[in-house]
């Protein structure tokens, strides 16, 4: 069976956890392939139980599914253990969670540097979560990182941490006037934490490819979204990894030819957390309505999300750079009770119309949305389970988004619950 990639098609917070949870009962593996605890997934079970996951794949809530934290993820050991403990206290079986030996560990000095650098940046800050994600990826690229497998050899681990802190302490003390970290203490704390997860360390790329050879289905779950991709996003207001579909192969060890379906997650409107350009952002009562009705508060940061109308320019862009084959449209129910529902179909930049993603940072910062207005609907759609159950105007809205985005809207979320979903096409069915 093929591998399936599930990615956010906007600036994150699109509802990827709901999509993973919906598909989880029919797949054998769920893999998180990038990012760290700087993003969160919210899953609402049919029982009404609400789970917020930051590092562990959403498939952990589905019995029988093996979950993998892939090599592309940066893992904060303390956060991992806290999240595991929280799940276990609520009766969730976590035995089927594995961690790639090649994933990188997020260290205390990464968090310290992240926070102090962002603080000193002042008005030029990019809105980092302050959880050390960027500095950890910097060390990975500089070949100075600590990998999960290193905890299995205390001698190697101590050598690596001592070497890293020779430089990190210079930065913390001499540049930012902060206290130096003691290498022996960092090593001791990490080895103590490792006792809680080292039995989960595995050769993930081997296991995943063997699973595909056995015709098992592997779901590759990204965090954040396309417009936060370090290469394809609104740089520099991006994350430090590749949430796009290309990152799924690199961050899991599964070859690209194994991937046959790319399921993009789109919110029926647009949100963003932190700094950066946002052409359709609303500052009026409509923005307040979307924020309140949609419950737009970050799962990980607790920060209020900026809200705006649906942006078809970035949806079309996401379709292209990810090779999206299908879309899962979430939170359509939030748009009920609006007289009209605008869709951004293009931009004007210095008076010139464009329907494509601007090439430069300065251009997207100056982009003004060009709207097409569709009539709204007043009906409560949270009970709809078939496409024809939706009001005609809601169906028209979905079909117009589908046309503009350039990929089939196969699933539609009409509420937070797992069962509050309309399936127009089965994305797991053989093509």
Swiss-Prot record:
Reactions accelerated catalytically: IMP + L-aspartate + GTP = N(6)-(1,2-dicarboxyethyl)-AMP + GDP + phosphate + 2 H(+)
Binding site for IMP: 13-16, 38-41, 129, 143, 224, 239, 303
UniProt function note: Plays an important role in the de novo pathway of purine nucleotide biosynthesis. Catalyzes the first committed step in the biosynthesis of AMP from IMP.
Gene name of this polypeptide: purA
Protein name, entry field: Adenylosuccinate synthetase
Native organism: Mycobacterium sp. (strain JLS)
Keyword check for GTP-binding: yes
UniProt-annotated binding residues for GTP: 12-18, 40-42, 305, 331-333, 413-415
One Gene Ontology MF term: GTP binding
Catalytic residues (UniProt): 13 (proton acceptor), 41 (proton donor)
SUPFAM superfamilies, sorted: P-loop containing nucleoside triphosphate hydrolases (SSF52540)
Family from the record: Belongs to the adenylosuccinate synthetase family.
Location in or out of the cell: Cytoplasm
Any single biological process term in GO: IMP metabolic process
Record pathway: Purine metabolism; AMP biosynthesis via de novo pathway; AMP from IMP: step 1/2
Cofactor(s) required, per the database record: Mg(2+)
InterPro entries: Adenylosuccin_syn_GTP-bd, Adenylosuccin_syn_Lys_AS, Adenylosuccinate_synth_dom1, Adenylosuccinate_synth_dom2, Adenylosuccinate_synth_dom3, Adenylosuccinate_synthetase, P-loop_NTPase
Subunit structure: Homodimer.
Keywords: Cytoplasm, GTP-binding, Ligase, Magnesium, Metal-binding, Nucleotide-binding, Purine biosynthesis
EC class name: ligase
Cofactor detail note: Binds 1 Mg(2+) ion per subunit.
Gene Ontology cellular-component annotations: cytoplasm
SMART domains the record matches: Adenylsucc_synt (SM00788)
Positions with a binding annotation for Mg(2+): 13, 40
Pfam families: Adenylsucc_synt
Enzyme Commission number(s): 6.3.4.4
